[in-house]
Amino acid sequence: MVDEDKKSGTRVFKKTSPNGKITTYLGKRDFIDRGDYVDLIDGMVLIDEEYIKDNRKVTAHLLAAFRYGREDLDVLGLTFRKDLISETFQVYPQTDKSISRPLSRLQERLKRKLGANAFPFWFEVAPKSASSVTLQPAPGDTGKPCGVDYELKTFVAVTDGSSGEKPKKSALSNTVRLAIRKLTYAPFESRPQPMVDVSKYFMMSSGLLHMEVSLDKEMYYHGESISVNVHIQNNSNKTVKKLKIYIIQVADICLFTTASYSCEVARIESNEGFPVGPGGTLSKVFAVCPLLSNNKDKRGLALDGQLKHEDTNLASSTILDSKTSKESLGIVVQYRVKVRAVLGPLNGELFAELPFTLTHSKPPESPERTDRGLPSIEATNGSEPVDIDLIQLHEELEPRYDDDLIFEDFARMRLHGNDSEDQPSPSANLPPSLL
């Protein structure tokens, strides 16, 4: 039945203020950073006729914030939050700029459907800016998790003439909060195949222990197995007993100083073909796949969303740009393959490390971007990933324009056993290690 609904109409997400006076409509909840541009954040706000007659001011506000401390510690004007992006748009009364700007296709359809009291808004986010990242709390932790997240808020301005103040309780009934996500897609680039050679010298041994490690490519998609090619040449008088391969996620917390947190997201140990004695060789390919389903209890793990949501993956690799400072990103995520050749307690280990990129498969081109005739993204490398990417980017786009609009509540699907109440953003609760 779900598939039939998707074929027969275009999904539109909506959320209404507690007093029912304003309703916000969005075509999708996830917006993709494609390297040269970010999907346009465009929607409509339906305003009650009473507010139209009273000429009440309605504003949309986009906020990307990095919460690195608990909200109950916010005292004396000192908050444990850093605002990375903050933009406002006056929805009503309309400005000359908003009146002259052409509507997107979805906005045109919503305007026809909702009537004259629906008004548009737009936000354009700079490419390679901060993306949504949540640091997973420990089991049993309460409150909101630490991380970088985006909030789209539409509200009716207070009438006491104050400005720049936090909305009063009386105004919260006139406010709609939507927790959206900005995700990263890394366009395919012809990059060299990752490879490293390492050697170890031993006392009382004339030869070296040599190990060569390589990956079949530099970029992988969520749910795709990583092929690790290992070649060992033992010219020493020592014996290699076994091999350990790890996938490590490194999250750099970029504040006043940079702190790094490492999480092991996949691991295999192999005794096949071992031991490799003096003069011996071993060549073998190992397949390892990092998945969130195997790491749900690890505190501090960086995710694309929140664990209680069904459509959440491990955080994608951050695409760094020489013109972008790490401090403006909040959290920088990277991945590495680490290989350890174990020789024994007295002889130590020989290890090698290779970085790689973990990202989403290529999403469809944004319809509005295509209409403007802007260049498309390079094709991917053609590799077919395993279908375990839980964030289905193609479902969030506007597929057709001759079908019906299907309105859905904005709240995301939750895993069984989690609270179904939609949580506002930005996130708040911080692992104690960051305090």
Curated annotation (Swiss-Prot):
Keywords: Cell projection, Sensory transduction
Highest taxon, organism lineage: Eukaryota
Motif [DE]-X(1,2)-F-X-X-[FL]-X-X-X-R motif, residue numbers: 404-414
Single GO term (MF): G protein-coupled receptor binding
Disruption phenotype: No effect on the response to the aversive chemical stimulus octanol or to volatile attractants. Behavioral adaptation to prolonged exposure to isoamyl alcohol or benzaldehyde is impaired. Recovery of chemotaxis from odorant-induced adaptation is impaired. Moderate reduction in chemotaxis towards volatile attractant diacetyl but not towards isoamyl alcohol and benzaldehyde. Slight defect in egg-laying. Increased lifespan and nuclear localization of daf-16. Reduced lifespan in a daf-16 (mu86) mutant background or in a mpz-1 RNAi-mediated knockdown background.
UniProt-annotated location(s): Perikaryon; Cell projection, Dendrite
Sequence motif: Clathrin box, positions: 390-394
Gene Ontology biological process terms in this record: G protein-coupled receptor internalization; positive regulation of growth rate; positive regulation of insulin receptor signaling pathway; signal transduction
Tissue specificity note: Expressed in head neurons, nerve ring and ventral nerve cord (at protein level). Expressed in the nervous system including the nerve ring and the ventral and dorsal nerve cords. Highly expressed in amphid chemosensory neurons AWA, AWB, AWC, ADL and ASH, and in hermaphrodite specific neuron HSN. Also expressed in the intestine.
One of the Pfam families matching this protein, by short name: Arrestin_C
Compositional bias (Basic and acidic residues): 362-372
Main location: other
Region Disordered: start-end pairs: 358-382, 416-435
Gene Ontology CC terms, in alphabetical order: cytoplasm; dendrite; perikaryon; protein phosphatase inhibitor complex
Keyword Amino-acid biosynthesis included in the entry's annotation: no
Transcription in keyword set: no
InterPro entries: Arrestin, Arrestin-like_C, Arrestin-like_N, Arrestin_C-like, Arrestin_CS, Arrestin_N, Ig_E-set
Biased composition (Low complexity): 424-435
Family: Belongs to the arrestin family.
Entry remark concerning the domains of this protein: The [DE]-X(1,2)-F-X-X-[FL]-X-X-X-R motif mediates the interaction with the AP-2 complex subunit apb-1. The C-terminus (aa 369-435) is required for the recovery of chemotaxis from odorant-induced adaptation but is dispensable for behavioral adaptation to chemoattractant isoamyl alcohol.
Function, in words: Adapter protein required for olfactory adaptation and recovery to volatile odorants, probably by desensitization of G-protein coupled receptors (GPCR). May play a role in clathrin-mediated GPCR endocytosis. Acts as a positive regulator of insulin-like daf-2 signaling pathway probably by forming a complex with mpz-1 and phosphatase daf-18 likely resulting in daf-18 inhibition. Involved in egg-laying.
PANTHER family for the chain: ARRESTIN, KURTZ ARRESTIN
Quaternary state and interactors: Component of a complex composed of arr-1, daf-18 and mpz-1. Within the complex, interacts (via C-terminus) with mpz-1 (via PDZ domain) and phosphatase daf-18. May interact (via C-terminus) with clathrin chc-1 and beta-2 adaptin (AP2) apb-1.
Name of this protein: Beta-arrestin arr-1
Organism name: Caenorhabditis elegans
Gene encoding the protein: arr-1
